[in-house]
């Protein structure tokens, strides 16, 4: 079992496994995994200014409920995990418990539990992940395109296009999920929150996304469970830096998605992992299938 050690210089908790080394930062706006290094190649995949597995925004239908980045929290350190708790507030009537657990040989699991005290339609935790801009994004999409048939999901790289330039691409789970990002929540600017146009496109085949460094054949993989993650968002890729929307590569997972009433409790899980890649880049999907066959996590006591 990997252990955590406090780094006095950063106040983050450093860890090392058989295949990766990294840091978990419970404090500040960019809490989460601030460093993740592939020990085989020495490559650091997280953008140095930001983090991964970062709890960014809280939403319901046409409602913004604040940003965990800016909210008070408490931290408990366990042998191989860091647990962060955000108490309920007037703006967000629910307690959030985020557990970052190091998993051998190459992963960090984020388990988030919501203990709801309010009534919310389409509740969402928007979780962000910011990576080295050299990394290229990939997603698997359902192959049911109009007028075309295919034998299985399609793996694609979202590339820049004038049709959706300047927007964030959203790959929803289903028709209900596709409505969430355009129901008004991303027009809410309370407490200085940013607004952006979200562009729902094709439906994802799995709650799975990965990025690649073609030269090193390294995959940075994010995965969740179908009932835990209802949409994946990304920034389109562009070979010309002038065509890029932002100076980093990123994936966001929209978590929960339920209609909630006081007393409801929900738990979701996301895994961040690194893997070598073969020529066919089959490892991320293999990792997802193995992950999806494991039992879902239990909520904390």
Residue ranges and their predicted role:
Residues 146-196:
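Low-complexity, serine/threonine/proline-enriched polar segments
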Residues 20-24, 28-33, 106-108, 117-122, ...:
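Primarily extracytoplasmic ectodomains and periplasmic/lumenal surface modules that are beta-strand-rich
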């Amino acid at each position: 079992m990997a252990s955590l050690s406090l780094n006095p210089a950063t106040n983050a908790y450093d860890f090392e496994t058989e295949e990766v080394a990294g840091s978990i930062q419970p404090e500040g706006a960019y809490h989460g995994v601030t460093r993740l290094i592939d020990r085989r190649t020495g490559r650091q995949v997280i953008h140095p200014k930001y983090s991964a597995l970062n709890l960014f925004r809280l939403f319901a239908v046409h409602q913004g409920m604040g940003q965990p980045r800016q909210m008070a929290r408490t931290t408990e350190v366990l042998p191989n995990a860091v647990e962060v708790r955000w108490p309920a507030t007037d703006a967000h009537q629910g307690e959030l418990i985020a557990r970052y657990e190091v998993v051998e040989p190459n992963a960090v699991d984020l388990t988030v539990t919501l203990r709801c005290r309010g009534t919310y339609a389409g509740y969402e935790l928007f979780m962000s992940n910011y990576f080295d801009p050299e990394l290229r994004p990939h997603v698997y999409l359902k192959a049911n395109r109009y007028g075309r048939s295919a034998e299985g999901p399609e793996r694609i790289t979202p590339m820049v296009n004038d049709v959706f330039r300047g927007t964030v691409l959203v790959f929803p789970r289903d028709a209900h999920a596709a409505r969430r990002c355009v129901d008004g929540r991303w027009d809410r600017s309370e407490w200085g929150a940013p607004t952006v146009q979200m562009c729902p496109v094709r439906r994802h085949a799995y709650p799975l996304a990965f990025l690649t460094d073609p030269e090193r054949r390294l995959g940075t993989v994010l995965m969740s469970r179908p009932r835990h993650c209802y949409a994946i968002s990304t920034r389109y890729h562009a070979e010309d830096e002038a065509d890029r929307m932002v100076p980093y590569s990123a994936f966001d997972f929209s978590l929960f998605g339920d209609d909630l009433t006081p007393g409801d409790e929900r738990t979701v899980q996301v895994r961040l992992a690194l893997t070598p890649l073969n020529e066919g880049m089959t490892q991320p999907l293999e990792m997802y299938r193995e992950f999806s066959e494991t039992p879902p996590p239990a909520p904390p006591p």
